[in-house]
Amino acid sequence: MINIYDSANKLAEDLTQTDQYKALADAVKVVQEDAESAALFKKMDELQTKIMQSQQTGQPLSEEDQQAYKDLNDQVQNNKQIVSLLQTEQSLYELLNDIQKTYSKPINDLYEDLRK
């Protein structure tokens, strides 16, 4: 019997060798090396976490948090290092989405006859 986790671990290892992963690692390093960008990224990450927690608990986002998000988003859009990081991250997630489609195909195929 196959150990699927061995395959998953190999996939994770292989992922680190892709151009997309390497580009993201470089983009993260660029942000880390710029104090302003790193601080802005941390602030953005903390606010996004707060927003997600509010959504998960069904609590409305305060006007203060909405304004903070808008202001922070404006700052992020003007920070070339973070914009580059986010674009690079998106490229990696597109690759991961393609991989997910590949390993989900057998499951989708099981249901194909039911969908007809």
Curated annotation (Swiss-Prot):
Gene3D superfamilies: YheA/YmcA-like. HAMAP family: UPF0342 (MF_01526). Belongs to the UPF0342 family. This is UPF0342 protein LBA1592. It comes from Lactobacillus acidophilus (strain ATCC 700396 / NCK56 / N2 / NCFM).
